[in-house]
């Protein structure tokens, strides 16, 4: 997990003994990914690259973390991330994704979560079988334990209403959620995409939203099919006065402890890349 540092609210500068930036001891990563929907009762078509994308999301983080800051070479800053949860296909059940236990191997143990699978108008779609189904924002209180970020590699997670209103029931301590208003598609360039995301956010010290938007512009669906496009988005939790918005934080300015964000949604940002489909 991550250790505490102090964020100076006026200067937005991190104070750490012997180093102007504090390094997290570790980032615990968890993934839920579904390719084989037939094993989950069907109801929708199978996918081809989501399990691989989940693996690449973790291993790309492992390649750049530790040593995220420009002040340190990659691999010199702290312990490597842990892959605390790797649920695939039939393992991605309603009970698994909604479980609020913060013990190892559960969703709320993980600092950063990844979901790769079908989305359906601001909900997760796990399959038509018993024990799967549609997971609504009210079913998945994010951040009751250690979860602080979520990246959804799925269609329409910010479609179907105003994101800050629709996702309000899910924000229970999470800082920010990344996803798409548009359709998203299987992408066999997920290593390049997620490596670009982690490098942008950590080593290049871009904001969370720009790290995601730029990675999608370079290696998202438009890169494979130039006539198409994407609309990625970032939804932040409400932030206290004099604090930078969580979607606009570079990783070096993140408060590296377990303190939950305010249990309210804040600003939503999006970017149209090419010609998205909805």
Language-model segments: what does each one mean?
Residues 94-110, 131-145, 164-173:
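Mature extracellular/periplasmic domains of secretome proteins
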Residues 23-115, 119:
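A domain-level signal for caspase-like cysteine endopeptidase catalytic cores
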């Amino acid at each position: 997990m991550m250790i505490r540092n102090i964020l100076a609210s006026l200067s937005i500068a991190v104070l750490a003994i012997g180093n102007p930036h504090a390094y997290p001891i570790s980032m615990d990563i968890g993934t839920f990914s579904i390719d084989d929907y037939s094993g989950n009762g069907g109801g929708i078509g199978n996918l081809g690259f989501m399990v691989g994308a989940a693996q690449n999301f973790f291993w790309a983080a492992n390649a750049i973390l530790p040593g995220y800051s420009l002040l340190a070479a990659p691999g010199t800053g702290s312990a490597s991330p842990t892959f605390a949860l790797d649920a695939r296909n039939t393992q991605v059940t309603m009970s698994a994704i909604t479980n609020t236990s913060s013990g190892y191997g559960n969703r709320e143990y993980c600092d950063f979560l990844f979901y790769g699978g079908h989305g359906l108008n601001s909900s997760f779609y796990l399959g038509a079988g018993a024990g799967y189904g549609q997971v609504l924002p009210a079913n998945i209180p994010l951040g009751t334990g250690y979860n602080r970020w979520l990246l959804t590699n799925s269609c329409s997670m910010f479609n179907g209403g105003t994101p800050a209103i629709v996702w309000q029931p899910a924000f229970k301590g999470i800082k920010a959620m990344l996803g798409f208003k548009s359709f998203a598609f299987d992408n066999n360039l997920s290593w390049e995409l997620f490596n670009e995301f982690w490098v942008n956010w950590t080593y290049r010290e871009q904001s969370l939203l720009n790290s995601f938007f730029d990675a999608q512009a370079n290696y998202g669906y438009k890169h494979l099919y130039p006539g198409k496009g994407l609309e990625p988005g970032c939804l932040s939790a409400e932030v206290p006065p004099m604090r930078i918005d969580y979607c606009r934080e570079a990783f070096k300015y993140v408060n590296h402890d377990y303190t939950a964000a305010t249990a309210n949604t804040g600003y939503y940002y999006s970017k149209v890349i090419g010609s998205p489909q909805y």
